[in-house]
Amino acid sequence: MTVDLDLLVQLGDYDRPQGVAERAVQAEELGFDRITVGETTGWNIVPPLTLAADRTEELGISNDVISPYGRTPAMLAQTALTMQDAADGRFRFGIGPSSPAITERWHGKEFDRPLRRTREVIEIMRGVSEEGTPAYEGEIFEIPGLKYERGPHENPPPIDLGTLGPKATEMAGRFGDGWTPQLFTKDGLRERLEDLERGADLADKDLSDLRVAPIVRGMAAEDRGKAREKARSTIAFMLGAYGPYYGNSVAEQGYPDVVEEIRAAWDERDTDAMAAALPDEVLDELAPAGTPEEVREWVADYAAIDGVDAVRVGFVDGLSEEDKRTTMEAVADIA
């Protein structure tokens, strides 16, 4: 199998940023190709990623979806280029439209025109890396521009987009270098890849020019019931409580009644009912959860989808260190 295997970790799982670097070393030893870390309302993503880059030799380093509202486009460009140099060319920058909750309740910005903003941020970032200036005239940003003191970069990091919907995914194909979707069934992913390819066509690119790395969250354990219970709770919570986008996406993939029931339970803040509303059929479509053999087979099948270049494996919530190690070992020999 020629696909890469990425490891997605959450900053909230660690007591200190150095823990991310320790996980990166573990991932490299097990044969993972890349580690990626998300940023929401906890630590700033840059120090943990820098530590991870410094402690590893060949492991790819990525941030997961970063908000286009929380930093200026020029600062995002500086961050990406700095990380690329810190990682000796192993960095990939991840961005996406974000969500109303993060944008308005954390960054204090209006969640306005997210796709247009994301596009303009990418174009400004490319201006800094390729032309040495953020100068730009757009519908959202007008920047007179100063000179980036380090000049154009010889090897700027690729830009990956985390998107779900058809128009957003078309944008990813057109303006990005990679795509990192989440919570897609196999059939749903195949269908959305058509939107990605359409966007690539608009930019005179092939689908093969993009790194397609779908995110899956799961758990492997000899106690199959425990693994499925924890995965069910996490996936249900994502569908009901993480804003509208994941739920809308899964509903459009054929499960509107399931999403509606989960959301109704969330309205009552009944997390047990949320989990109970996620049937085995849907859990099996969305998450690798079960024995190590079952999880390994699930991820291998997902990796075999035509057009997939990597599978980005993350943990469901509430795992012990032993649980995480078992899950990593279950999938480490797939790539």
Q: Where are the language model's segments positioned?
A:
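Haloarchaeal acidic low-complexity proteome signature biased toward cell-envelope/secretome components but also
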Residues: 1-5, 14-19, 26-27, 202, ...
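N-terminal beta1-alpha1-beta2 module of alpha/beta enzyme domains
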Residues: 1-62, 69, 157
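Internal, glycine-rich beta/alpha segment that forms the wall or movable "lid"
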Residues: 3, 77-81, 85-210, 221, ...
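Hydrophobic faces of well-ordered beta-strands that scaffold small-molecule active sites
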Residues: 5-11, 35-37, 60-64, 91-95, ...
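Active-site mouth loops of central-metabolism enzymes
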Residues: 5-18, 65-74, 153-164, 217-221, ...
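Short, acidic/polar
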Residues: 14-27, 79, 162-174, 291-302
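Acidic (Asp/Glu)-rich catalytic clusters
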Residues: 25-29, 49-60, 80-91, 173-174, ...
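An alpha-helical appendage that flanks or caps ligand/catalytic pockets
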Residues: 112-148, 194-301
